[in-house]
């Protein structure tokens, strides 16, 4: 995620989205952030869908992600590049490994086994991600711009 500089005197990033770094300037959507955060915690799949320009990426990056990070989630941002030679499932596996390596350690460290499905990758190790204090952290897959 690239950081967008925000002027405190005029804290609107224009067409750019708010980020975790600029969340202190993101106002007025607390009820939506609370509801969507609860929904993510209760459901295996939550879809945030709407017209372009409504602030979906901003509410995600500046609202939901910081709140869920405090609740023990590790956001894994995934944007599939269909033009790449790497299969989408492999891109997702690599995004998970990259995002989680800075958070802590896996209880059964390993890498992706060539040829395994994404489901197998997510389930075969009976693994947990632990932070530096030994608390379990839950990876949260975020597919932004998924409609592309």
Residue ranges of each PLM-predicted region?
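Amphipathic helix/helix-loop-helix segment enriched in hydrophobic residues with interspersed Lys/Arg
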Residues: 1-148
């Amino acid at each position: 995620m690239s950081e967008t500089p925000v002027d405190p005197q005029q804290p609107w990033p224009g067409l750019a989205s708010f980020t975790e770094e600029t969340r202190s300037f993101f106002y007025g959507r607390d009820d939506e952030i609370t509801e969507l955060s609860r929904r993510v915690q209760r459901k295996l799949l939550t879809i945030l869908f709407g017209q372009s320009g409504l602030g979906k990426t901003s509410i995600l990056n500046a609202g939901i992600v910081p709140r869920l990070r405090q609740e023990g989630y590790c956001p894994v941002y995934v944007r599939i590049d269909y033009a790449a030679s790497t299969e989408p499932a492999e891109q997702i596996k690599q995004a998970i490994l990259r995002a989680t390596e800075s958070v802590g350690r896996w209880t059964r460290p390993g890498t992706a086994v060539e040829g395994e499905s994404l489901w197998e990758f997510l389930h075969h190790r009976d693994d947990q991600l632990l932070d530096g204090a030994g608390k379990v952290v839950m990876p949260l897959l975020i597919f932004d711009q998924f409609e592309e």
